[in-house]
Amino acid sequence: MTDNRVVITGLGAISGLGITADDFWDAMKSGRSAIQKLDLPIENIKISLGSTVPDFEPENFFSSDELSILDRYSQLAVIAAQEAVNDAGLICGENILSNAATIIGSGCGGKHTDEDTYLQLYKHNKTRAHPLTIPKGMPSAAASMVSMHLGIKGPAFGTASACASGSHAIIQGMTMIKSGITDTALVGASDAPFTYGLLKSWDALRVASDDTCRPFCNNRSGLVLGEGAGMMVLESAESAHQRGAKIYAELAGCGMTSDAGHITRPDIHGITNAMEKALHHANLYPDEIDYINAHGTGTLVNDATETEAINRVFGVYAKKLAVSSTKAMHGHALGASSALEIVATAQAIYHGIIPPTVNFTEADETCDLDYVPNVARKKDIRAALSLSLIH
């Protein structure tokens, strides 16, 4: 058993903000939101807003044979994963990549495949499903497809924990490197939730905004869904230094908890416990954190509870923290949100710029922190914390 330091050497992102990590970061710096009116051929849906990948033509990235086995969420995962590998300066076929782990989370998996299958069977009265329906739509499909496309032959599997799926994938990769199981891991998450069945289900939850996503504001009215994938290459610090790799940030520690309570209502004790565990694991004091990338969904309950949890953990220092939610820019991409937010946090540390909370008007009386309203802020960031919750 070892205790290797773990660093981020490659980033990939595809979202409503664009098809590359550079597009993603440019939007973060400028405070541009991708939330807009949905243009989908779907009737009887109350949800009218979303953040979808702009001008996305899968045929520009994949052959017709490849598309026959790739659900939309796997397509997004492969594109972002390829970018992260290229950004890290790794080459397919090299030992460092061939032996890497591939761990990719998802909150909902291949829902486009499921929906297409249901339409064929129940609307068009087909008598059989496509023979590749199962491998195309399974929750681990993205991990398998990324592994196959990049020739990665280390362990490949998925994680599923709702909005924290990406964080858990990244933590798993970090843990495997720290323990010496592998030197390199390609990790992240992908989700593509814009299907009739999922949108009707989100309608039923009654947490979606018909205005826009305004985290921590007194007139916030709910979340706005998004789609996308965030990927990163993790390496042991020794491996990265040996090959002269660019290092965005170090993953110093993590904290994971369960509320063991209500399935949708957050418990402040679980949130505070997770942050305290992360600080302890990273050997950091609260006053060494300069930035928190918040879960910040824009719902009444989440934002107030999250703010109170930060106040409890950081005490008087909480008012000196910069806290922002990037969901107001890229939307709530379910399991992919946590991965996209860790990509944003790594970029913030590397570039010394804190992404803003856009669409910000006036803070709620229960939300009393510095939420970096509307305009990005230059700041040397010693350490940052990314908070992903499951509600």
Which residues does each predicted region cover?
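Conserved beta-ketoacyl condensing-enzyme motif
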Residues: I8, F24, K29-S161, S190-L198, ...
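Phosphate/pyrophosphate-binding loops at sites that engage ATP/ADP/AMP, CoA/4′-phosphopantetheine
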Residues: A84-I96, A240-G244, M275-Y291, V313, ...
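Glycine-/small-residue-rich "gating" segment that lines the acyl/pantetheine channel
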Residues: K123-H130, H168-I171, T175, S190-Q242, ...
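Short pre-catalytic strand/loop immediately N-terminal to key active-site residues, enriched for Gly-Thr
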Residues: A129-I134, G154-S161, C217-S221, L321-H332, ...
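Conserved small/polar residues in nucleotide/adenosyl-binding loops
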Residues: I390-H391
